[in-house]
């Protein structure tokens, strides 16, 4: 019973996430966080432009709340919106921008390189972009692009690397977009920082 409930909740979150992505193309939607509370379900929406999530006089956020409750069966949803301060360092925003560009017909290689340049320009330690699916023909393939330093496994990868997966719906089929970003402010467990030792100035008094 617990397993069924867990699966049902995961499916619901996936469907709501896809709904928000399609409903908020101009908001710079990244991801959402769902938490159950004693009075309902709190859904925190992370976006580059919160104004597009709220809408004029709260019209959009009201529509989102009603749809999530009626169509997806979420118990008393309460939507909270948080702005992403550095969108080019947010894996969700970057992945969504790549997916949207692919859906507009832009070449995957050009889109990936452009995204990597923007991320690294913000001081990221490293970034990985993976695009997989039917990119140019009937055969599926995976393209991986990387710059800088990246932890691929272990605890540092899980806790320090921001990663997100989005999909782009193209004529040839669905293309997966995965972005991993190692932010500039983190310190790795095996990173050694060498500090400069300030030189001491000795003052000697000479008596005449």
From Swiss-Prot:
InterPro entries, sorted: KH_dom, KH_dom-like_a/b, KH_dom_type_2, KH_sf_prok-type, Ribosomal_S3_C_sf, Ribosomal_uS3_arc, Ribosomal_uS3_C, Ribosomal_uS3_euk/arc
Molecular function, one GO term: structural constituent of ribosome
All residue ranges annotated as the KH type-2 domain in the record: 16-85
Gene Ontology biological-process annotations: translation
Pfam families reported for this sequence: KH_2 (PF07650), Ribosomal_S3_C (PF00189)
Keywords for this protein: Ribonucleoprotein, Ribosomal protein, RNA-binding, rRNA-binding
GO-annotated cellular components: cytosolic small ribosomal subunit
Gene3D superfamilies on file: 3.30.300.20, Ribosomal protein S3, C-terminal domain
Function text: Binds the lower part of the 30S subunit head.
Subunit: Part of the 30S ribosomal subunit.
Family: Belongs to the universal ribosomal protein uS3 family.
NCBIfam families recorded: PRK04191.1, uS3_euk_arch
Name of the protein this chain belongs to: Small ribosomal subunit protein uS3
């Amino acid at each position: 019973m617990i397993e069924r409930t867990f699966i049902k909740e995961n499916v619901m979150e996936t469907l709501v996430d896809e709904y928000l992505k399609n409903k908020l193309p101009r908001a710079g939607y990244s991801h959402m966080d769902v938490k159950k509370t004693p009075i309902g379900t709190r859904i925190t929406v992370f976006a580059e432009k919160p104004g597009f999530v709220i809408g004029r006089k709260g019209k959009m956020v009201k529509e989102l709340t009603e749809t999530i409750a009626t169509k997806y069966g979420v118990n008393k949803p309460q939507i909270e919106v948080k702005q992403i301060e550095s969108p080019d360092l947010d894996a969700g925003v970057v992945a969504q921008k790549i997916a949207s560009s692919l859906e507009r017909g832009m070449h995957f290689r050009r889109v990936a390189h452009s995204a990597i340049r923007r991320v690294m320009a913000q001081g990221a330690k490293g970034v990985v972009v993976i695009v997989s699916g039917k990119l140019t023909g009937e055969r599926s393939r995976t393209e991986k692009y990387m710059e800088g330093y990246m932890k691929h496994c272990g605890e540092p990868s899980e806790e320090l690397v921001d990663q997100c997966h989005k999909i782009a719906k193209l004529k040839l089929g669905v293309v997966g977009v995965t972005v991993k970003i190692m932010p500039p402010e983190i310190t790795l467990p095996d990173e050694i920082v060498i500090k400069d030792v300030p030189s001491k100035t000795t003052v000697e008094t000479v008596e005449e």
